[in-house]
């Protein structure tokens, strides 16, 4: 029976040794998996940091150049530079007479012409009220010239028609 006991003990030792070896292999596999997970996590952290830096760069760029880029894209979309600035938050106005012109694309604006009739009428009324800033200057003091008459100008229409006493 001693050989059976020795064989059983040897088999038990072999099973224990196989269990220890499989445990060591499993632990090594677990270590490899943890190292892979750590590598993936480190890569994820690097990418997140790069995304945050890129986001900060974009925020800074938009804070500095955002309005200019918006205006440029609106001009490229077909708006006039003034209308693009108005759409981007500018306070400029475009008046046709006493009315503010709405924001329109260039294609629509090509059919609208600005006549400036109201400005011409306002200029004429101002000239009647205040006088014109052009023309002959007032006569210098002590200078006598028939072209410098203090009387208002006269309109000569031609010879007088004959008069009759009927």
Swiss-Prot record:
Alphabetically ordered keywords of this record: Capsid decoration protein, Capsid protein, Host cytoplasm, Virion
Single GO cellular component term: host cell cytoplasm
Leader sequence segment: none
Region (Disordered): 138-166
Note: Translated by a ribosomal termination-reinitiation process from the bicistronic mRNA coding for VP1 and VP2.
UniProt subunit comment: Homooligomer. The portal-like structure consists in 12 copies of VP2. Interacts with capsid protein VP1.
Free-text note on domains in this protein's UniProt record: The N-terminus domain points away from the virion surface.
Name of the protein in its database record: Minor capsid protein VP2
Organism this protein belongs to: Sapporo virus (isolate GII/Human/Thailand/Mc10/2000) (Hu/SaV/Mc10/2000/Thailand)
């Amino acid at each position: 029976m001693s050989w059976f006991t020795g064989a059983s003990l040897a088999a038990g030792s072999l099973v224990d040794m196989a269990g220890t070896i499989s445990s060591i292999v499993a632990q090594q596999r677990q270590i490899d998996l943890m190292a892979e997970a750590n590598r993936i996590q480190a890569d994820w952290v690097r990418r997140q940091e790069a995304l945050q830096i890129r986001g900060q760069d974009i925020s800074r760029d938009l804070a500095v150049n955002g309005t200019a880029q918006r205006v440029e894209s609106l001009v490229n979309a077909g708006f006039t530079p003034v209308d693009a600035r108005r759409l981007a938050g500018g306070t400029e106005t475009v008046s046709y007479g006493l009315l503010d012109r709405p924001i329109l694309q260039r294609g629509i604006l090509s059919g609208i012409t600005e006549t400036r009739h109201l400005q011409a009428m306002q200029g004429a009324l101002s000239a009647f009220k205040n006088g014109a800033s052009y023309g002959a200057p007032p006569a210098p003091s002590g200078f006598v010239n028939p072209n410098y008459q203090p009387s208002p100008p006269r309109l000569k229409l031609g010879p007088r028609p004959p008069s009759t006493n009927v």
